[in-house]
């Protein structure tokens, strides 16, 4: 097999691959054995006609399509491996020369992982991240715990107030006509949370269970759904239920109820310790992010669009999974946020670009500094993951696919590259 590699613009590589005639003949024979039953030839039962007869009757090229697929796939995989080419998309195949007894010649044009030009990456200067947990931080955490332990009580003797939790049915109309995505039943809303369009929640104040309320709002000019942007709308709302949070008193009894401590002061001290540990953890990661951000900013790389689109695909899938855990799906979320799918994807584009650039730069640093990941490190990380899933290590390993192992390896490599950059940075 002969391979010629030519680098084109925009991270495109074109390979011209020449495969020996004998290899192509083997593939044609395989194609005949696979497809012979599909052809009808007078004088022969279906699938019993010799290859030469079928070719004479239907033409020499009758078995070429599958043969080309077989040969090109194998030759392409071998060519990119031997030439250290790292595709990020499927190749476009073009046949240049084909025929009986002749070498098969084809080109494969493919987008490849871009080259990274590192700028300054050792000795970058960043400011130290200070850790400071205040009394206000402790009080805020106490209030959050109190919120979680609040009793939710139905309210019947007064109207809706800010902070109340209401259960409502609603349907929206524009010019007297209902619109798509404007209707829901049993929707639970905290009044004053700003979940809905400006003005919607305020007009619920004073309502009681069983009330029918007409809410008039205007969709923002920059609303995601263009057909609704800037238009006035009427929502017919039925109040099903009104509840209020009753917060517990924050005292020694509260501390006993929610913790292992007997006094509020002891509980506060434990909160301060927990917040300090969390703040130190955040500070460490913030420092790492600052260092990496400087190194990434100093680097140059031209990222192909296909890599960005695939990163966005991955981000959308992850986002949808998180929404599913909350009992939502992406369509419902987009309706609530008032944006369409393409707008949502566009909002992710810059982050996708930055994530890919960060990954590529860290890979380059690891390569330049000869940072490696050992089998032992992969094994240790797999064991940690297994424990997080309450699985035995050996059972977990049995379920690992090659791409799972590569993901674990990449995660360790990036962490080691980040550690290297932080160790070699100037912390001011």
Swiss-Prot record:
Annotated PPIase FKBP-type domain ranges read 163-248
Q: What is this protein called?
A: Trigger factor
Q: Where in the cell is it found?
A: Cytoplasm
Alphabetical list of PROSITE patterns matching this protein: FKBP_PPIASE
Task: Give me the reactions it catalyses.
Answer: [protein]-peptidylproline (omega=180) = [protein]-peptidylproline (omega=0)
- Domains (record comment): Consists of 3 domains; the N-terminus binds the ribosome, the middle domain has PPIase activity, while the C-terminus has intrinsic chaperone activity on its own.
Q: Which UniProt keywords apply?
A: Cell cycle, Cell division, Chaperone, Cytoplasm, Isomerase, Rotamase
> What GO molecular functions are on record for this protein?
peptidyl-prolyl cis-trans isomerase activity; protein folding chaperone; ribosome binding
Q: Coding gene?
A: tig
Q: What is its EC number?
A: 5.2.1.8
**Gene Ontology annotations for the cellular component aspect, listed alphabetically:** cytoplasm
One Gene Ontology term from the biological process aspect of the record: cell division
Q: Which NCBIfam families match?
A: tig
Residue ranges of the TM segments:
none
Q: Short name of one Pfam family for this protein? A: Trigger_N
């Amino acid at each position: 097999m002969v391979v010629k590699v030519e680098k084109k613009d925009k991270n495109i590589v074109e390979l011209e691959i020449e495969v020996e005639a004998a290899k192509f003949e083997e593939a044609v024979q395989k194609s005949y054995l696979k497809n012979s039953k599909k052809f009808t030839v007078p004088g022969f039962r279906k699938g019993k006609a010799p290859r030469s007869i079928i070719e004479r009757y239907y033409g020499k090229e009758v078995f070429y399509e599958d043969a080309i697929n077989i040969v090109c796939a194998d030759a392409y995989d071998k060519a990119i491996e031997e030439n250290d080419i790292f595709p990020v998309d499927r190749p476009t195949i073009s046949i240049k020369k084909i025929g009986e007894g002749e070498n098969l010649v084809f080109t494969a044009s493919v987008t490849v992982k871009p080259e990274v030009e590192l700028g300054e990456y050792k000795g970058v200067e960043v400011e130290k991240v200070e850790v400071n947990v205040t009394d206000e931080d402790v009080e805020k955490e106490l209030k959050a715990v109190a919120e979680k332990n609040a009793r939710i009580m139905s309210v019947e003797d007064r109207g809706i107030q800010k902070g109340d939790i209401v259960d409502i049915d609603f349907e929206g109309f524009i010019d007297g006509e209902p619109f798509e995505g404007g209707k829901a039943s049993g929707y639970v809303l905290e009044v004053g949370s700003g979940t809905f369009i400006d003005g919607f929640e305020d007009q619920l104040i004073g309502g009681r269970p069983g009330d029918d309320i007409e809410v008039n709002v205007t969709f923002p000019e920059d609303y995601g759904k263009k057909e609704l942007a800037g238009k006035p709308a009427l929502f017919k709302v039925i109040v099903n239920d009104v509840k209020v949070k009753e917060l517990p008193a924050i005292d020694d009894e509260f501390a006993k109820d929610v913790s292992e401590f007997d006094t509020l002061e002891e509980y506060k001290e434990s909160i301060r310790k927990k917040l300090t540990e969390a703040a130190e953890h955040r500070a460490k990661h913030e420092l790492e992010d600052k260092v990496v951000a400087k190194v990434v900013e100093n680097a140059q790389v031209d990222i192909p669009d296909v890599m960005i689109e695939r990163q966005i695909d991955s981000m959308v899938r992850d986002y949808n999974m998180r929404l599913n855990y909350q009992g939502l799906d992406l369509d419902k979320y987009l309706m609530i946020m008032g944006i369409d799918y393409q707008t949502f994807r566009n909002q992710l584009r810059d982050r996708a670009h930055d994530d890919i650039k960060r990954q590529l730069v860290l890979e380059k640093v690891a390569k330049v500094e000869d940072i490696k990941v050992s089998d032992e490190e992969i094994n240790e990380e797999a064991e940690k993951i297994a424990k997080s899933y309450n699985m035995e290590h050996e059972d977990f390993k049995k379920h690992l696919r090659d791409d799972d192992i590569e993901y674990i390896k990449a995660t360790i490599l990036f962490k080691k590259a980040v550690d290297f950059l932080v160790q070699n940075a100037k912390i001011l």
